[in-house]
C-alpha cells in the first residue's frame, strides 16, 4: 500500500461515511481552472481543526490515478462542473503530511527530508520500473525522470506544511534547508500540474522575499474566493441544525463570527460537529488548540497590547495592522504582530463591515468571534496577574446585572469604584471611551444569553453609548446606558431625555432602564442613577 504516491481513497471515504459530512467539493472547480498554468500553486492557511486534512484527502482521492474514485464524487456538487471528468483520476498524486513526517524524524529536519525523499523515490521506482533514475537522492530530479517517460504530471498535496516553521522557528539553518528543499521540488518544474499546501501560518518571509514566492496565498486575513471553504457557511449550519434538531441561534452564538467580505458568516466546523454529536453547546476549542499559547501571547510586554486585549474581552473591536507580520511565532516587534498571529490561530476574527475606518487590506478591525473563544479568553485571564482586575470584574457580572435590574444604583457605583481602585487597573481612565470599555467588560458575561449589545447607537439627536436589547423570548428590561467623565450621572440621564434617545425604542414594547454613570477624576469615584421608562 503506497504511503505517498497515489494513496488509496479510503481516508476520504471515511469522511463521506461519517454521520456528518458537508460537501466542500466546489473547491475542486477553483483548482481545476489553474491546473498546468502559472497560477497552479496554492497555499491555504487556517486554524487547527478547520478541515484542512479532510480537504487534502478529498483532493488526493479526486486527482489520483491510482483508483477510480468516481463513485465518491458523482453525487457531490463538483460532478456538475464542466471540468469534473476532465481532471478526475488523471494525475500522479504525491501526498505528504509534514506533521507526521516531522514527528517520525524526531524533529530532525535533515533526517525528515532524507527519509521522505528516499521513500517517495522508492515508490516511484516500484510504479515505474522502466525509468532510469539519474539522481535518486534528489526528489525533484526523480520526479522529472518519471514525468519525462510517463508524461503524466504530478499533483502535490502537502498537509501541515508549516509544522516545521512553527516548531523550528529559532533554528534558521533547519528552516533554510526545508524551504530550499520545497523550492527545489516546486519552482519552475514542468512536472507539476498543481501544488496545494495547507497550514496555519502563511509562508515565512525573509526580508521582503519568500523562497516559495511562486505560491498564491490565501489566509484568515485574505481568503479571497476560498472563504466559503475555511469552515461551515451559514446555510450549511442551518441545514445541519434542521437535520439534527439543534438550536440555530445558539449555534450561531457559540461558533459563528469569522467574517469575510463576500461570506459574512463562517463557523468553526470541528465545534459544530462536536456540538451536534454531543447534543450540547460548549467550548471544544481547548481539545484542539494549545491552551498555553494564548496565555503566552497575551502576556507579552508590548505597548498597548494589554489595553487591546481588555477591549476585546469587553466585546469591542480593535484595529490591527497585519502588513509587517513575519509569518512566524517568534518575531514580535509590536502588538500588531501578536494580534495578527491570533487572527491566524483563530482566536480573533476580522470584521469587514465594521464602523471603524480601515482599508481591509493591511489594516483590519478585529474582534473575538464567538462565545467559544470568549470562554477561552476568560479562562486565560482568570489566573493571570496582569489581568486580575479584568477577571474580578467579570466574576461580578451577574451580581452587577441584578443590581441594575433592581435599580440599586449605589451597588452599581461601588462595583466600578472597586474595579478602579484595584492595583492592576483595568484601563487608564482618560475619557468616556475608557469608561465604556469597563462597563462593557463588566456586563459581558452576564448579558451573553440575555441581551444583544449595540455601541454608539444613533438615537434621536445623538448617539447612545450602550444599548442592551433583550434577546427574543427574554423577559427583561432593555438597558440604555449613558456615560459621563467628570460631569454627573444626572447630566447623563438628562442627555438621554433631552436628545430623545428613547426614539430608538419606538418599535420596542416593554420597560427600558435608563442608566447614567459618571466618573469623577478628582474623587476617583463613580456615581450612578437608574430610572425606569415604559415604551
Predicted regions and their residues:
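Mg2+/Mn2+-dependent nuclease catalytic core
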Residues: 172, 176-178, 485-502
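Domain-level recognition of nuclease-like catalytic cores that cleave nucleotide substrates
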Residues: 504, 510-535
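Metal-dependent nuclease catalytic cores in nucleic-acid-processing enzymes
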Residues: 184-189, 194, 340-348, 440-445, ...
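Active-site metal-binding core of divalent-cation-utilizing nuclease and nuclease-like domains
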Residues: 143-150, 449-474
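Phosphate-binding site recognition
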Residues: 1-431
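Acidic-basic catalytic patches of nuclease active cores, encompassing PD-(D/E)XK
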Residues: 420-453
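Structural motif
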Residues: 155, 477-481, 513
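Conserved catalytic cores of phosphodiester-cleaving nucleases, focusing on short active-site segments
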Residues: 439, 464-468, 477-487, 499
